[in-house]
Amino acid sequence: MEGFLIAARFLHFTAAILLTGVFAFECLVAYPAVRRSGAAPGSLAGLRRRLGWLAWAWLALAIGSGAVWLVAVAAGISGKPLGAALSQGAAAVVLTRTRFGEDWLLRFSLAVPLGCCLLASRRAGGAIGWAALLLAAAMLASLAWAGHGASTPGLAGDLHLTADLLHLLAAGLWLGTLPPFILFLVEVSRTGDTNWGAVAAAVTRRYSTLAIASVTVLLAGGLVNTWFLAGTVPALVGTGYGRLLLVKIGLFIAMLIVAAVNLLRLVPRLGGPADATRNLIWRTVAQLQGNARIETALGLGVVAVVGVLGTLPPGLHTEPAWPFPVRLDIGELTLGPRILLAILAVAALVCAIAAVAATAAGRYRRAAVLAAGLALCLAVGWIPLRPAIERAYPTTYYAPTQPYAAASVDRGAALYAEDCTLCHGATGRGNGPAAAGLPIRPADLTEAHLFAHSPGDLFWWVSHGMDEGLMPGFVGILNPDQRWDVINFIRARAAGVRAGQIGPDLTTGAAPEIPDFAFETGRTQGTLRQTLENGPVLLVLFTAPAPVERLRQLAAAQSSLDAAGAAGNRGRAGRIIGGNRPRCWLAPFCRHSFVRGECRAGAVSRAR
């Protein structure tokens, strides 16, 4: 069923893109160029007939594939076979009660007047031709509401949808115009008239201008779509969606290279001296035909990938399985190496683009020099980049399924006591009862290096073990949520130990993050995370029995809090003292709490 849906999407997108391209080539490229070259518009009568039949074929394919797409969606939603989805009314429900059905009806309502335009006698560049172009473009643009862009909420969704819409239109103006351009070149070759060389040059230059504008829009729209649907390197290389997106980008780059050869090497030949040999003109036209066919094949590959991508969850909504044994942690670098890497990255990009352009133009010596510059940038960049290389695992970029909150920490404490204390010890310092008999001492889970690893790294070790089996994996013992609970407890306890080592002086170093927790003050309930959304918070955590002397000191410091912006409300333990920023809490924590500390923006900033 999924393959059927993908095939229907591919055919429908292809038909809509190519249908727009037929009218765009007529109205924006062929006839304006013919008029400018001084040739008689009637000389393209044969091309007009062929383009008309081509438009009918694409319109029929759009209608047929759209109907199949509707049935496939109805079958997928209802869980029925294709025939049953059609005969038992599932398709009618999708058509009348879903957004997909509304968009489908819009496209097919546009197909009717478009067919009427094809039936009418169209003059080159006349009003009917322009009307047909607008109708076909509207059909193509409406497909944006059938993609992921329509599901993004808010203003971001408006931006995403607009980018998707422009992306589709640009595809119609570039990829869609390739088959008509090929037909035009075939017509030029068929005539055998050298006077057509000027017409071919005018059409090709105008087509190149349209292609450059379309590619610019495609690049901008593609960047926006990638940001919303992948957005991160792990999502690009570690998910099925991201890897398919990279395939699409690779095919697109190949199209750009072929187009660059046409623009920089072949088009100038057509616009050369008037006494250029006939063989040179026809040889150039033949090469343009071949390259246009290659571009078309690559473009259809891009559309095929789009057909699959629309059936997959975006990379940002999928757990990425990191495929490499290492990763880059740029945060480990100081400012100087970061600036150097940024400069080298820009230089490498410029060298790469210039080298491709020089190769396409046939300037191979210049391309070799630029390739050497690219290699030099990469070699020099390796030196400052080495400290940022870290060991990585398939789960390195996993997001925890359990929130980093007090409830999860408490559950993890019980699991840790049952499964981990024997080796790591009750305090987590690697001094459990069995530690002395092990050839490698268990890791100290309270040291600062714990925070150098991502939660996904910890998840891999807890799941699959480490040190060649000395630490066993817990895949068959704890379910994924339980493993995340254990990790949250380990992180919380290490944060508490680290907070206890902080002196009275403020530092610029990153402080460990405090887990979220719920609180109640009178009739008001909330969480630390919710409160932090309203501004900085001064948080004091303690365990029973309450540190009475310390609480008195804090009460005496109320004037300092007032000076910092807090309201002058005094409270008792367990209540907020200060209604405005910075808020101060005196909050009893669970039995596996941090040491007493202050929290600013979610992190311990100074021991109390």
Question: What are these model-predicted stretches?
Answer:
Residues 437-495:
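Extracytoplasmic electron-transfer domains, predominantly the class I c-type cytochrome c fold
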Residues 568-571, 579-607:
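Short, internal strand/loop/helix patches
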Residues 295, 528-555:
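Short active-site neighborhood of thiol/selenol oxidoreductases, capturing the structured segment around
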Residues 430-434, 546-561:
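Typically the conserved alpha-helix immediately C-terminal to a functionally engaged Cys/Sec
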Residues 406-407, 417-440, 465-473, 493-498:
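Periplasmic/extracellular electron-transfer cofactor-ligation site
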Residues 488-518:
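N-proximal helix/coil linker or "cap" segments that precede and/or mark the start of modular domains
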